[in-house]
Amino acid sequence: MPSMRSATTHRRYDCRLPIALAWLLSCAASTALAQADAGAAEEITAAPVVETPVETPADNVEANERFVASTITGYGRNSLQTAEAYVGLADAQRKAADYEKAAESYLSAVEVYRAIDGPFTPLVIAPLTSLGDSYREAEDHTNAVASYGEARTVSRRVYGLHNPDQIVLLDRISESLLDLDQLVEAEAQQVEALRLIQRANAPESDAVLSAIYRYAGWLGDRGMFQLERDQYMRAQRIIRQSYGDSDPRLVTPLLGIGNTYRRERNPAGPGISALEDALELLREQPQRDALGLAMVMRDIGDWNTAFGKMGYAGMEYQRSWELLGTLPNGAELRDDWYAGANYVLYEPISQRGVSTEREAVAGHVLVQFDIDVAGNPGAVTILESDPPGFKDEAVLRHVRRSRFRPWVVEGVVAPGPGLAIRVDFRYLPDAIAAESD
């Protein structure tokens, strides 16, 4: 049986791009002091410093409350202007983390829209979706599912049972069901999203293939690697039957198959064979796909690094780096792929002591390390942990047993210094206290 979603997450840091993987940098700001010219004929008086008041979330809520009141006075309770004002108030209350009041305001907006345009007006879809998002942020996942479901009901009634716009709502329902540890029900939403695309498009269309890959990725993110491979193989069969054995569309499922084995930490032969088949297929194409070739070579390099090929010198990494130099966004891709902490073999983090209960509180561990040219971590050090010592050993073991993509600097495989990863988790303080006793 597949495991439930992990209660831990990890973040990696980049001083330039918050979502990229990079090393910690110490950022210092310098201030220049202006001096008056000693020979100046006129005395220059410094302008008084005026402090600009900083608006707080509470200030924004009060302003929106006043706006709602004035809008009702000016336009009446059941008006589009009033409904929009309620949505603005709800957004402000949500930003201030007053989720109970935010729910009331979103529901007031829904009530007004329905009074104006009927119970199935499409105007309620957006506030109902935002209401679900607010419930999720408040960790009220049951009500989140209900709100998203109501928004989807309206969408199906207005735009048709098979309209693709409801897929974003299915995704939200799926995520909330995962939060409730209802994996089977969550997967059912993803299957329904795939079926919606299949009903609206030809079986061999790019839209259907993309939907299959999307579902495959969802399965892989939950650790269901064989089921993920099954979807890639399904796409492979569709492409071969519709476009032939040499169509470049085959590259995507081949890479998907190969990388599932690596992410599963399974060095089975079919994994590297799929990657090599993708490379051969691209080389046979009449027009060179530099990005595709760079990606395949990167993934072959990741396989060799992950499974410790003896004497591997990173040839595929170097060739991939060179190919990226021919692309308009090559510099950005080089930075994304060949700098920072990029896993090639992910050692699972022990879930002992972590909790998905609603009353669980947040904890984290921040760890720093280097990687050598073979992708091995070294000098692994805990920089910060909360609560101290609770998950330190688990995170240290995770980093030491994982493997990372080495850097490529000016075309040469190089070590990566001073990388950092933050692992976030939730735990029950009482459980820790009982364990220590």
Residue ranges of predicted features:
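Membrane-interface segments of envelope glycosyltransferases acting on lipid-linked substrates or membrane lipids
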Residues: 137, 169, 182-183
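Bacterial N-terminal signal peptides
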Residues: 18-30
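Charge-biased low-complexity segments
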Residues: 35-57, 61, 65, 74-83, ...
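Non-catalytic localization and substrate-recognition regions of ubiquitin/SUMO ligases
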Residues: 94-95
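N-terminal secretory signal peptides that target proteins for export/translocation
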Residues: 1-15
